[in-house]
């Protein structure tokens, strides 16, 4: 009897599909049933081959060998996951298999994952496509009952290949050209470089900003009411001090007459469900977690604990087929402190409204929500518990009714001038009950602060005991932190110098710079290549980053290039543009970029040369600020030697409670704090032992130190193999 091979993107999804299809027999990298064989990728198993696979001369980076423009790009198996590729290959080549079902993520990249495997195996069997937005049993059953012909997604596949090949031609050539021309590792790309440019532009805005003093007026009444002056346009600030001085002087000995009391009943609805970017932003703001760290925590909650849904999503909505599962999800997450909240929601039928249920706004995956799986808090780390708390509270909040309140605005006249006061009375706590009414709102639009208003009637006269001038200064734009940088990457249109509204709209609709799955890696790569650095929570551009922007072609610095690409990739996906035409344009563009870099007369200057020499080649070492501390790296990119000088740890200073920096090597290592505190590593170990009641031993300390160096979870992507070979100067 003939069977169908189902290719899922990850083992966890494969297990869900196999369970529904009754594939119980376990094999080496697959699950088999009477009709189906379910196997899986691990992200990408196949990628574009390295330059040296076309010509051995490309093993060495030489400017004269550029541009590298192979007529046809080849595929290669990623070594890291070659075993699983062979497992998938063996199932595809089975004689009893007559059909392939692509069940990877429903989107451009998911299509590429499966099709590259099929192309590399060189198998020609009929293809069908499972296109679902969630992996519930019902969604899987419905999807298999409505499989689409594979050819319906040929254009989507062509679009995905076009994107990958364009990144190969431009990214690898531009990086090699910059690196060899200026003898410094200067990697660039259509996402990385505009991101660095946005950070540089923000720093320029801050540098060029000139603070202005503004003035206002506040009146205080004998019944402790504070009234704020407003002009005819509703502004409570003025840059004209003489005007404000004159008003204050003219109001002496005037009382306030209540002219109007405006009562409005208002509603505010819960913020939307989390997508990955929004979750990364909140985790950074509340806990200081990096985007990469939040993604890694989410992966564990998704794959290991199975309590949250797929993390790499760009949707803040769920699809209608998920609504029926909400009661079970509420029962699963409704434990501990969440029990009374979940119980309250379950008392009434759940209404699926457009604020969180919208099929049209779910593409590859729905928003991050709890699963129906059992929750065991004792198995969570502290960080996992915090991220889980964010997601569950947001999930509960959207299912609660609106926050309702009555806003009272008091309008008074003092002389001929208008003064107002504002207060709020809560009618129904609604979703804010989930946050114990401590949710931070961002809806403050003026300088009028809400206060408790006394009982007042229209026409009342209020005795004014004090009229005073207030003042403040305009503030420069804030530096980016990881939370705000993620927002800027998601919506870079306000940083674009373009009059092309359609281009800006396309960039916005296609998700901005990078994707939810890649932004954390991109930010991490910018730190690791020393183009940007952290000072506290703020992100600063380095001298190297500044020089990179000065050396790269102008077009690579703007998000516009990504917008133009996305327009054309969208046209390919719709069958309106041939992939070959786009790639031909990219090859010509690559020639222009390489030519511009070759003819540049600019110089790259290392302004961070230390007094240390490289132990391998003897050349000067450069001092750089890595993401987690200071490092020394060899100036010669061919050598690539690097060593840690110091790194920020999770150990806290016993005096000021800030994170300690670990400096030095071996037995001479010492913890240091900005407040001046110093402590040898050996003394630190003794203190830790005493604080833990003499229960700590060497293994505890080693485990602690190992945690500081723990590497992030590897993620297969099309350029993983190519990029890992890069040496950073």
Curated annotation (Swiss-Prot):
An example molecular function term from Gene Ontology annotations: magnesium ion binding
GO process terms (BP): DNA recombination; DNA repair; DNA topological change
Domain Toprim: 3-136
Residues carrying the site annotation Interaction with DNA: 61, 168, 176, 312
Domain Topo IA-type catalytic: 153-594
Residue span of region Disordered: 686-718
Cofactor: Mg(2+)
Chain intervals for the UniProt region annotation (Interaction with DNA): 187-192
E.C. number: 5.6.2.1
Catalytic reaction list: ATP-independent breakage of single-stranded DNA, followed by passage and rejoining
Keywords tagged on the record: DNA-binding, Isomerase, Magnesium, Metal-binding, Topoisomerase
Coiled coil (UniProt feature): none
Residues engaged in binding Mg(2+): 9, 105
Active site: 310
Composition bias, Basic and acidic residues: 686-713
Enzyme class: isomerase
Transmembrane segments: none
Function according to Swiss-Prot or TrEMBL: Releases the supercoiling and torsional tension of DNA, which is introduced during the DNA replication and transcription, by transiently cleaving and rejoining one strand of the DNA duplex. Introduces a single-strand break via transesterification at a target site in duplex DNA. The scissile phosphodiester is attacked by the catalytic tyrosine of the enzyme, resulting in the formation of a DNA-(5'-phosphotyrosyl)-enzyme intermediate and the expulsion of a 3'-OH DNA strand. The free DNA strand then undergoes passage around the unbroken strand, thus removing DNA supercoils.
HAMAP family: Topoisom_3_prok
Family the UniProt entry places it in: Belongs to the type IA topoisomerase family.
Protein name (Swiss-Prot/TrEMBL): DNA topoisomerase 3
